[in-house]
Amino acid sequence: MDDSALPSNTSNGINGRTAHRRSSSGGDPFQHPDIYYGNPESVERIKNRRRAFSSSLKSFNRQDFHEMLGDRNTRRGSMDPTSGNPRKFLIDVDATLHSLLEREDSDRNMQITIEDVGPKVFSLGTAASHGYNRFDVRGTYMLSNLLQELTIAKDYGRKQIVLDEERLSENPVSRLSRLIKNSFWNSLTRRIDGRNIEVAGRDPKDWTDDPRPRIYVPPGAPEQLEYYRRIAEEKPELRLDVQELAAEITPEYVRDLNEKPGLLALAMEEKYDEKTGKTDFAGVPFVVPGGRFNELYGWDSYMESLGLLASNRVDLAKAMVINFCFCIKHYGKILNANRSYYLTRSQPPFLTDMALRVYDRIQNEPGAMDFLRHAILAAIKEYYSVWMAEPRLDPVSGLSRYRSPGIGVPPETEASHFLHLLTPYAEKHGMEFKEFVQAYNYGKVKEPELDEYFMHDRAVRESGHDTSYRLERVCGNLATVDLNSLLYKYEVDIARVIRVYFKDKLEIPVEFRTPATKDIQSESSSVWDRRARRRKMRMDTYLWDEEKGMYFDYDTVKQERTNYESATTLWAMWAGLVTPRQASAMITKALPRFEEFGGIVSGTEESRGAVGLNRPTRQWDYPYGWAPQQMLAWTGFARYGYQEEAERLAYKWLYMITKAFVDFNGVVVEKYDVTRPIDPHRVDAEYGNQGVDFKGAPREGFGWVNASYVYGLEMLNAHQRRALGAVTPWETYSKAVSAQGSDTVLENRSE
């Protein structure tokens, strides 16, 4: 970060300010853009005030100022003198935006970053002088904030604005937190109903000849089927294709649906429409990850819920639990995402913890107990029908695997993605590439090696860790640390809920039973307690390595433990399944293997192995770090009393995000290279990085990174948050605290 990137007042207070200051126009300088840029009255007030000046004063227009001041870089001494009062700038949006980009955006990417070689100083006219007096805005951070504010003002159609200097010099921790809470969550929120089905129903991964909005409605929701058919009739221009799903979902059926891929319906609620005066259906909202991920995703939603709760958006977190329960009830599982080609594929299960966290915030509201009951019943059904059933359950070890059933090439990727893999098989059968893919998908040619490959490929995608050398070509055989830690948490949570909230007996309605549990009319806590104890015993037997102080995945086919060191070993601490002795071993032996400059890395460099042209980097391997690994680790460390470790690692992760945010025009991305101090958002592995490619201003960040930021701030004390606001590296902060502590000890001794 360049020396002038941050203004001198950014570290003032925990949030950069002790309270929101009222601007001279009577408004909060940190208002939401809907309010701040939604009303042009502030500019009119400035103009009216000027008209009230003595008529003996010479009248100046904007061209006069340009002729007087020109475009020269004026000395700081010739600018508006420093004032104790917050400045406001009177700005012509289009002209200023054009001039700013011409001067400062040297690489012409519509962003102002530390890599641009402009003068890093830009003069603005003050509102108090009607633009006559000028003031320099200096440094990458303030200039990029100016670009962002002008871009947003232009989005709102504003030609002129009065802009608070405080909005440019705002403490970066406060600014990013505010953007996440007030803007990013809203930008990432979706509903599926007639008002937006045209956009939501379209799929960029629809490779068919006739891509069109299409929605599949489960047979158990006839009211939705009627609703969407009505929408299709009322709006024929949408070309909306409404289909009812079959009652039985098989791999063959899902394969056939790939010819007509579509959106899967989610939960709806009845709402009164003030415009029509009638009650109609509205989609229950959900938060999407961002970028090209525009559906309800499985474990992304849990991670996002942690941030939503930290942002006091309990309504959205609750709504996503409701959507998950709908998915389990009608589709049999929490889906990878709500698209037809994901019908046989799930994702890491977090429903019980998610529901309990939401319940803790709504427990005094009407219907809270019904909400908890419904969520736990759904989790029990998912546990039995998905994770404790074939093909995911390994009957020998008693542990579970990611092993999604399916047929053929995964349709969400273009077939050309597997060109290198499939071409030799096509040549073997004397077929063109597309012809072979079609023949293979429909069983006209048999290739057991490909069957094995795609079984593991689907498993990797179900694990959420796509892709990693830890899982490649073997995932479907692995009883992984992460999945079995999550299922242990399910077992413990379900036992506690039944015991504490339902008097140790939870009645199971017929719709929440599975073929294997059709005769189980109620559940008791003791059964689930025993399951948790058995799972821990099996994990300690098959997965725990005493010498290395960590858990490893277990290959159920080879019947041996793997040796890939993965940060998922720390999920066991999050789940609470380790003993205090094991926790101590993980902190002293395992954690140092994963701790890097920017937090926890997905896996060790040694485990990943050499990479190069013929063995490219995978995004879930070293040197990349992901928000889920960080949040679960912090929570696990704090759970076992390792608060210092939790704070240190949270600080490192948040510092890395903050520094990229300050230096690179407000960027917030899907994943980071936790070994790169300068530009950690630069990730070239596989699919690139979501959240990088924006023009002028970031609109949404990325779901689980947004969550990790506001959730992580809750881990830090006030002193750490102030240091973070000054973009202080952990090492500098730690040394300062240690030195301060040493001085205090010496002072006490001298007394």
Swiss-Prot record:
Enzyme class: hydrolase
Biased composition (Basic and acidic residues): 64-78
Phenotype of the disrupted gene, per the record: Abolishes trehalose degradation during conidial germination and delays germ tube formation. Resistance to thermal stress.
Main location: cytoplasm
Function: Hydrolyzes intracellular trehalose to glucose. The disaccharide trehalose serves as a storage carbohydrate that is mobilized during conidial germination. Regulates the level of trehalose as a protectant for cell integrity during heat stress.
Biased composition (Polar residues): 1-15
Binding residues annotated for Ca(2+), in chain numbering: D105, D107, N109, Q111, D116
Subcellular location(s) of the protein: Cytoplasm
Induction: Induced during recovery from thermal stress.
UniProt GO BP: ascospore formation; cellular response to heat; cellular response to starvation; trehalose catabolic process
Listed name of the protein: Cytosolic neutral trehalase
Catalysed reactions listed for this entry: alpha,alpha-trehalose + H2O = alpha-D-glucose + beta-D-glucose
Pathway involvement of the protein, from the record: Carbohydrate degradation
Database matches in PROSITE patterns: TREHALASE_1, TREHALASE_2
GO terms for MF: alpha,alpha-trehalase activity; calcium ion binding; trehalase activity
Regulation: Activated by calcium.
Binding site for substrate: R292, W299, D300, N336, R345, S346, Q347, E412, R461, G464
Active-site residue numbers: D466 (proton donor/acceptor), E670 (proton donor/acceptor)
Cofactor(s) recorded in Swiss-Prot or TrEMBL: Ca(2+)
Pfam family, one: Trehalase
The UniProt record lists the keyword Hydrolase: yes
Gene: treB
Keyword set, alphabetical order: Calcium, Cytoplasm, Glycosidase, Hydrolase, Metal-binding
Protein's organism: Emericella nidulans (strain FGSC A4 / ATCC 38163 / CBS 112.46 / NRRL 194 / M139)
One Gene Ontology term, aspect cellular component: alpha,alpha-trehalose-phosphate synthase complex (UDP-forming)
Span list, region Disordered: 1-42, 64-88
